[in-house]
From Swiss-Prot:
PANTHER family in alphabetical order: TRANSMEMBRANE AND COILED-COIL DOMAIN-CONTAINING PROTEIN 4, TRANSMEMBRANE AND COILED-COIL DOMAIN-CONTAINING PROTEIN 4 TMCO4
GO biological process, one term: clathrin-coated vesicle cargo loading
Protein name: Uncharacterized membrane protein C6F6.13c
Protein origin, superkingdom: Eukaryota
TM segment ranges: 356-381, 401-423
């Protein structure tokens, strides 16, 4: 799968000379996979009696007695419904002379799975200050990590952080060197520089770096000192730390002692300095309330240069949050800062004025377009109406001078203008309607330090679960929430993507009407409808979905600004219309100058026209990865979006974005069969971009509509359309007859409006189009 380069970093060739002090040379690092070692959370040793079981006999199991340092243990278990059940198990008492001593510690949640167990070197570090306690204070852990690091390692630690911070500033500053740059990222650059200075000062203060040492670190990039040169000091270093043998049993798999009295002895344990640096940096950022999206990106970058992958860093981050007492953990809880209804009400108030202006413009435009076309074709329409009246025996009305005179033209023009204004106003009101349904639905909510927000592109029905496409995401990556927005709109999105078939049905209806009494009338009305297409352009469901996705994205930005999901970094993932929601969320965050929220963004099949200045602003909000997944032969997205947008611009979901540094482009043509397959292919796509997934299969995702059900839906469609044709014809004829004081008898009416005949005509259309008709519809 081709992945385009995110672009080169700029070091000193910046348009603003004041930015040169924050530029750093490009640093390339190789990411290596960390090994997964089983944690020392539960250390058990099996003992059997010497004479009861033969050494080579594995036929029967013998009862095994255990000894515990505590009289009881609370063992957390998880049932099929993911509900934690606490079960208290009594410990059997045995004599010390019969068994060797052992110590058991039970971990929570998914730590029982070896994949989710913390690295043994990281456990050593945390268990130094634990001493068997459930939680560790932040101050005590910071004191321990500070004592472990030597002066040389502290300098290397500070230098690595400073060079990586300069590299992050350089990522935004590089935008200013683009030839078409016009100051779009000025606010983002200023905010990033402020964060860089504040974070660097906190690290210097914590490590006790002197003024002279600070000057030396600030000039490292000028002397061609690379990050790899400093990271080697930290990667190869180990520090011996004296801990109790109780903790040593937990973290170093030392040999068992002969008695319980040996647990009080002291012995040294080798500590990996890499985990010491990560733990120290994370706690410093948390303690100073600096842990935003940029700080987490810095933590991941430090882990990368220390040869620790993001998955291991996420496990370590989770373990620290769970075991260390952090004063402001309440900020990690969702909904702690804002009320959803209040934010939605505020957004409605802001968009109301713009909505009324657009409705007025649509009404004026609709009246002009339909009024003018009706006036130009008034003679033809009058002739058609006269021919229709002649068909039903109203020759007097057909030959009257009114239809042939100027009065009929004025009446038809006025009626067209009034109906056009009504169509334009109501269509725009529907298109610019406020978001009525918006909700964060949790998939995994365990108070992690980061949160992932997923946005679906459509639903199979209003009762569909928007979390299904992302259900296989590994919960270790963070708290996961899915946005439940406008279910009616999402349920109809799949139908709007079949607009080609809608056009075919429209043509078939015209053929059916052509075989009835209103031949001349429909022939005259066909041209003004084709010329205007106003109802199609304004009230088309696809256009409504696009506008509602934009409004939802703005509302999502409001929610994130008010910290509805807590004060923590946010990663956004979406496909199809969900990707459009995320794009306009980024645009709104840039307008609000909120650059501390979004860490990573992953978009797939985005129905957004590419405009480089707009996408540059959206990219300036993202501190980490910005991934654009596209499918080159997505004909559904190409036809629908380009048709409704007049073919202007280029669709991001169909091509790569290669003129903005920092955006990664991934071609998913070989991974996704079509646009409608994005929903069930999300586990595969997430794994392709680097997410940890529990399973790439789509068992948890609902299957497509079966073929028999599709045929039944097609048959129902024909019947509904036939009834609509019948009702429209009946209403027109009865209205004309009422003006003359006449009416059709029920018997003649039933014979005249035979829905069975209309249904047969529709079936002929189906037979004419054959299999191509069904394939285009579905």
């Amino acid at each position: 799968m081709p992945i385009s380069s995110p672009g080169t970093r700029c070091s000193s060739d910046l348009k603003d000379p004041t930015l040169q002090q924050y530029s750093a040379e490009s640093v390339s690092t190789e990411q290596s996979l960390g090994t997964f070692e089983e944690s020392k959370g539960s250390i058990t040793e099996n003992y059997v009696q010497d004479s009861s079981v033969d050494e080579h006999d594995d036929g029967n199991w013998q009862p095994m007695e255990v000894i515990s340092l505590e009289p009881t243990h609370l063992i957390n278990d998880i049932d099929d419904d993911n509900e934690i059940i606490e079960e208290k198990k009594e410990t059997e008492k045995v004599e010390e002379s019969e068994l060797e001593p052992r110590y058991t510690r039970v971990f929570r949640d998914e730590d029982d799975d070896q994949k989710h167990q913390l690295d043994s070197e990281a456990i050593k570090l945390l268990d130094i200050a634990d001493h068997g306690n459930e939680e560790i204070s932040m101050d005590s852990q910071l004191e321990i990590t500070g004592n472990i690091l030597s002066e040389t390692e502290k300098m290397a630690y500070a230098g690595v952080c400073r060079l990586l911070i300069l590299k992050m500033v350089d990522k935004i500053a590089c935008f200013t060197t683009l030839p078409w740059y016009r100051g779009e990222c000025k606010a983002a650059l200023e905010d990033t520089i402020m964060w860089a200075d504040k974070t660097t000062s906190c690290i210097y203060e914590h490590l006790g770096v002197t003024v002279e040492e600070q000057k030396m670190i600030e000039n490292l990039h000028k002397h061609s000192v690379q990050i790899d040169d400093l990271s080697k000091i930290l990667v190869s270093a180990h520090r011996a730390q004296t801990v109790s043998s109780l903790d040593a049993v937990l973290v170093d798999e030392v040999e068992s002692s002969d008695s319980l009295s040996s647990l009080g002895k002291e012995k040294p344990v080798q500590i990996d300095v890499r985990w010491t640096v990560l733990c120290d940096l994370f706690l410093v950022l948390i303690s100073k309330s600096l842990y935003d999206c940029r700080s987490r990106s810095l933590l991941m970058a430090v882990g990368e240069v220390l040869d620790i992958n993001e998955f291991d860093v996420a496990k370590f981050e989770k373990h620290i949050v769970e075991t260390i007492q952090i004063d402001d953990t309440g900020e990690l809880e969702a909904g702690s800062s804002a009320n959803t209804e209040a934010v939605m009400k505020l957004r409605r108030k802001v968009s109301r004025r713009k909505k009324y202006i657009l409705m007025g413009l649509a009404g004026i435009g609709g009246g002009l377009v339909i009024g003018l076309s009706s006036g130009l074709l008034a003679p033809i329409i009058s002739a058609g109406i006269g021919a229709a009246f002649t068909t039903v025996g109203l020759s007097g009305v057909a030959t009257s001078g009114f239809l042939a005179g100027g009065g009929s033209a004025a009446l038809i023009t006025a009626g067209g203008a009034i109906s056009g204004a009504h169509i334009g106003t109501t269509g725009m009101a529907h298109r610019k309607a406020d978001v009525k349904t918006f909700e964060f639905r949790p998939l995994h909510a365990q108070r992690r330090a980061n949160v992932i927000v997923t946005v679906s592109g459509w639903m199979l029905s209003k009762e569909d679960d928007v979390r299904l496409s992302f259900a296989t995401l590994d919960p270790i990556v963070g708290d996961i929430y899915s946005v439940f927005w406008e279910p009616e709109m999402l349920a109809s999105a799949g139908q709007t993507m079949n607009i080609l078939a809608t056009e075919v049905v429209t043509q078939s209806l015209q053929q059916v009407l052509g075989s009835t009494v209103l031949v001349s009338l429909m022939g005259a009305l066909q041209w003004p409808l084709i010329l205007t297409k106003l109802g199609y352009l304004i009230d088309n469901p696809w256009n409504n979905s696009l506008d509602r996705a934009k409004a939802t994205g703005q509302l999502l930005a409001d929610m994130l600004c008010y910290r509805s999901l807590g004060v923590r970094p946010v990663t956004l993932v979406g496909y199809s219309l969900g990707a459009r929601v995320i794009y306009y969320c980024l645009r709104e965050l840039e307008k609000k100058k909120e650059f501390s929220i979004i860490e990573n963004v992953y978009l797939f099949g985005t129905p957004v026209i590419f405009k480089r200045t707009s996408w540059l602003k959206a990219a300036s909000v993202v501190s980490g990865r910005f991934v654009n997944g596209y499918k080159k032969n997505d004909w559904i997205l190409g036809y629908l979006f380009r048709a409704t947008s007049g073919g202007i611009g280029r669709v991001a979901g169909l091509r790569q974005i290669d003129c903005i540094p920092g955006i990664e482009n991934i071609d998913v043509t070989n991974l996704v069969s079509g646009h409608l397959a994005y929903r069930e292919s999300m586990p595969i796509l997430l794994a392709a971009v680097g997410f940890e997934v529990l399973d790439e299969e789509v068992d948890l995702v609902s299957e497509p509509i079966p073929e028999p059900l599709r045929e039944r839906q097609s048959q129902l469609l024909y019947e509904i359309e036939a009834e609509e044709c019948q009702n429209k014809q009946k209403e027109l004829i009865e209205k004309s007859l009422m003006q003359k004081g006449r009416s059709l008898s029920p018997k003649k009416s039933n014979a005249f409006f035979d829905s069975k005949k209309i249904r047969e005509e529709l079936k002929k259309v189906k037979k004419k189009y054959g299999s191509s008709f069904n394939s285009r519809w579905y």
